[in-house]
Structure formats: C-alpha cells, structure tokens
Swiss-Prot record:
Protein name, per record: Tachykinin-like peptide-X
GO CC list: extracellular region
UniProt entry tagged with the keyword Ribosomal protein: no
Predominant place of localization: secreted
InterPro entries listed in its UniProt record: Tachy_Neuro_lke_CS (IPR013055)
Modified residue annotations for Methionine amide: 13
Tissue expression per record: Expressed by the venom gland.
Entry superkingdom: Eukaryota
Keyword field: Amidation, Pyrrolidone carboxylic acid, Secreted
Family membership noted in the UniProt record: Belongs to the tachykinin family.
Localization terms from the record: Secreted
Chain positions with Pyrrolidone carboxylic acid modification: 1
Length: 13
C-alpha cells in the first residue's frame, strides 16, 4: 500500500 506517505503526514499533525 502506498499510504505511508499520507500516514506520516497526518501523524505529524
């Protein structure tokens, strides 16, 4: 799955 980028982005929020 290519969702790690978005996950990290939201994780920073």
């Amino acid at each position: 799955q290519k969702k790690d980028k978005k996950d990290k982005f939201y994780g920073l929020m």
